[in-house]
Amino acid sequence: MHPLEKFEYCPLCGSHHFETNGATSKKCENCGFEYFMNPSASNVAIIKNVKGEILVERRKQEPAKGMLDLPGGFAQIGETSEEGVCREVMEETGLKVVSAQYLFSLPNVYRYSGIDIHTLDMFYLCEVEDDSALAAGDDAAECMWIKPEDIHTEQFGLRSVRWGLIKFLVRQDRFKSAEEAQK
């Protein structure tokens, strides 16, 4: 189901004449208000320690509860993507990001409360001040360091994180191809 199908009433005037107007919008026949469904901004941190291991988390909540993940989450209103990734890393791991370098973005669909939330996940290579303060918090049940060669992407619950890890590891020459990364 497309997320726009859940919106039956105009959020401006309350009219029931809120009709689909193309693939990404609905328009009110009563007041003329047009609502565009755009992806939500989300941030993902790839953090390596001095041994070259990558920081991963075990998800505490749905979706994909109990599966592996990378630190990250939704951007908040008024913050930059860089501020968002720093905030999420602090909330979920207790670590302070001192550098966040943008890598790439991937689209994703995040099922939450029965609705498919379309996201644009922005991946950052982050450097932290001191990784000895590592402690799981917020959405993370636990945090751990994993050697790149020990990463099995099928253990990660979110599609964009799986593909983001593959893309990152292929770039780092940890895998020769995306197919090898999925083995």
Locate the predicted segments by residue.
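Short linker/helix segments within small regulatory modules
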Residues: 19-25
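Short functional micro-motifs and their immediate structural scaffolds
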Residues: 18-19, 36
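Conserved Nudix-box catalytic region and its N-terminal flanking loop in Nudix hydrolases
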Residues: 49-91
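Short metal-coordination and nucleic-acid-contact micro-motifs, chiefly zinc-binding Cys/His arrays
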Residues: 3-7, 24, 41
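Nudix hydrolase/Nudix homology domain
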Residues: 1-6, 133-183
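Conserved N-terminal beta-strand and adjoining loop/helix that marks the start
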Residues: 30-54, 74
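Active-site-adjacent beta-strand/loop module that shapes the phosphate/pyrophosphate-binding cleft
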Residues: 104-132
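Short cysteine-rich clusters marking metal-coordination/redox-active sites
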Residues: 10-13, 28-31
